[in-house]
Amino acid sequence: MPEVVDTCSLASPASVCQTKHLHLRCSIDFTRRVLSGTAALTIQSQEDNLRSLILDTKDLTIEKVVINGQEVKYTLGERQSYKGSPIEISLPIALCKNQEIVIEISFETSPKSSALQWLTPEQTSGKEHPYLFSQCQAIHCRAILPCQDTPSVKLTYSAEVSVPKELVALMSAIRDGEAPDPEDPNRKIYRFSQKVPIPCYLIALVVGALESRQIGPRTLVWSEKEQVEKSAYEFSETESMLKIAEDLGGPYIWGQYDLLVLPPSFPYGGMENPCLTFVTPTLLAGDKSLSNVIAHEISHSWTGNLVTNKTWDHFWLNEGHTVYLERHICGRLFGEKFRHFHALGGWGELQNSIKTFGETHPFTKLVVDLTNTDPDVAYSSVPYEKGFALLFYLEQLLGGPEVFLGFLKAYVEKFSYKSITTDNWKDFLYSHFKDKVDILNQVDWNTWLYSPGLPPVKPNYDMTLTNACISLSQRWITAKDDDLNSFSSADLKDFSSHQVNEFLAQMLQNAPLPLGHIKRMQEVYNFNAINNSEIRFRWLRLCIQSKWEEAIPLALKMATEQGRMKFTRPLFKDLAAFDKSHDQAIRTYKEHKASMHPVTAMLVGKDLKVD
């Protein structure tokens, strides 16, 4: 088979050389907003007569490159937009196959690094100390340090990080001690070790006034002190989720499973950084109702972090399997009907994404072609929900959940510590179900994997928990003005928060509604008083799409007081599409841009066609 090319990386491919270990020594400078230090990369040649190699960098200043104590020649290539600049390093000796060399690169990041957000004290809960966090997925690790920034290469790492002594540093690794910085009594050095090989997008760092509380035998929850108690309560189910995940996926090999609750500008719901999952504070609903995100990040400890997509074209392998595991964890905890309820909700989200892109858009394919495309721009619910739908469909085709979970466990065992493509997955599926090849051959593989739009088949879903949401949404959609008095707060008295959210998702698929309906909905249900972020998000979108001017300040507030892109991007888009809030939306974006996460700022700017 031809070699799979990672079009998102400018570095030498895994077939030429492979980074085996990184030792990072760095110092965090909050005044200049830079990370500076040395990255010592242990690189193994994969061919004979290797005389030079290329690494990814982005907005890095390179001070020198040293091999065996000697400075060597290097060339920093021209910037290639979102891909950054390749650095070509000349080797002092030609390497033969499997020979290893340590390359020590002294570097400094840019204050504009796309991987880092630097927060002022005012942007934190405590208001006293600055804060730094990283987000490397998909291709931002190169904006922190020179690397082969591709998920096809896995490495172990160790680190020593110097920070102001009143702050705490954490990484996606096992904590390995702390000591005063011998070079500066006002600083402290934190040490870390990650002994499981990982793709470099899983390297992560946070520095802030962090505290922790133990919530399980292998779990501390970390945050600023203002959020610690609330977070400990919200995520108390973590250990029971981990145990179920081990039952489904095999032993948890990472040792620690800590959680970090970040400041509100964190751009994602969660990030599966090994040993330290990062999560958004928008999960702090007060009733544990958004804990499926924790189940999702836990599941990545197997699908994504152990078995990894070889390139970002195959991102669905990470996310589809992880959503599949996540929903099984929630099913074990809350019942099979609940699993089906969320599965069907996911199909609705897939419909929304396809409607947003357009049904022929290439980003609606399961396997995408990211040649000359920034993965951040292509990102959507498609790899998650189209991927899940394929696995859920296969489950139903091949004999049910137990049968398919058997496949999943075997898949994890087969491909642990490797990076794979969709073809590798499909070949293994066929070999695992070799007695059911006739059934597998009924699958319209080409449409499922490589065609845009909705899948060719919709799986079967148990409707028990969804029916109440549908019937209430249908009542509202069909109601005439005279019927509005028939609604009351009693409509929702038997609804879980998940069902309230699904009801609003149904309404949103039928937006806009007459303004009178929206005002009546607020009168009887008082949705403005609900702080659950998922419910509030859908309610405010429904209000803006139905052109309720009174909701404009509330929607602008939600779009800016947190930065989870799932919420911020659609809210800004809806506000910009409403003539009464268009100018205000653009003005608000411009005012907040400098304090937004760099990726969020870039994508909202694209959405609003600003810049």
Swiss-Prot record:
The modification Phosphoserine is found at S416. The record marks Y379 as: Covalently modified during suicide inhibition by leukotrienes. The modification N6-acetyllysine is found at K73, K337, K414, K573. It holds the Pfam family Peptidase_M1_N. One of its GO terms (molecular function) is metallopeptidase activity. The record marks D376 as: Essential for epoxide hydrolase activity, but not for aminopeptidase activity. Zn(2+) binds at H296, H300, E319. Binds 1 zinc ion per subunit. It is found in: Cytoplasm. Inhibited by bestatin. The epoxide hydrolase activity is restrained by suicide inactivation that involves binding of LTA4 to Tyr-379. 4-(4-benzylphenyl)thiazol-2-amine (ARM1) selectively inhibits the epoxide hydrolase activity. Pathway: Lipid metabolism; leukotriene B4 biosynthesis. GO terms for biological process: leukotriene biosynthetic process; peptide catabolic process; proteolysis. Its EC number is 3.3.2.6, 3.4.11.4. One of its GO terms (cellular component) is cytosol. Keywords: Acetylation, Cytoplasm, Hydrolase, Leukotriene biosynthesis, Metal-binding, Metalloprotease, Phosphoprotein, Protease, Zinc. A peptide binds at Q135, C136, Q137, P267, Y268, G269, G270, M271, E272, R564, M565, K566. NCBIfam families: leuko_A4_hydro. This is Leukotriene A-4 hydrolase. It comes from Bos taurus. The lineage of its organism: Eukaryota, Metazoa, Chordata, Craniata, Vertebrata.
